[in-house]
Structures are given as structure tokens and as C-alpha cells.
Amino acid sequence: MSRAVRPIILAIGGHDPTGGAGIQADIETIGQLGGQAVTIPTAITLQNSHQVVGFEPVAAHLLSQQGRMLLEEFPIAAIKIGMVANVENCEAIQALLRPHPEIPLLIDPVLA
């Protein structure tokens, strides 16, 4: 008996150290819905479960490199974008996704 292949969802967003939001919450949600998550962090947030006091963006070139590696290896079924930490990351994400218009995209902006 063969196992069903789980759809692979690329989650792009911030790292919430409490797991209540960001890519940690995306991983949990995607798994509960039967998918497999692969992730690209856009920022490390400075927070606890009561407050966010700041964030540090991930360098755009690192985001781009990680994205290319994941898109080359995995058959991405959909992409979810959450927190985009700065303009440079927004441009890197746009360049990364431009060659893949066939992949469904969900945008859930956190900071605008």
C-alpha cells in the first residue's frame, strides 16, 4: 500500500520564538491540514507571548539563496507569505517568485 504524497507548502515569514505566530505557527497549521511545510524566515522577532518589542530582518541574499534551494528541490504546491521585514526582502521574494506564476500564492501581511 502506497502512502499519499503530502503537498509541500512554502511558508515565508517571521520567526516567532513563542510559536504562536509566524512560520512556527504555519508549520503546525500546514501539518494539521495534511501538508508538509518548508520555510524561509524573513526576520527574527524579539517578543514573548505578551508583546513584540522589535525584529531583525534576515539579509535578502540569504532569503533568496534559501528560496532557490527549496524551489529547486521540492515540488511546491502553494506559497504562504506572512511578515515581510523590509523592502529588500520584499524585492527578493518578488524576484524569487516571478518565474513561478503557476504556484498558488496566499498573502497574509502582518506588518504593512
Language-model regions: role of each:
Residues 1-78:
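Small-residue (G/A/S/T)-rich helix-start motifs and N-terminal tracts that mark the onset
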Residues 78-81, 85-112:
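Conserved beta-alpha-beta core of the PfkB/ribokinase-like small-molecule kinase fold
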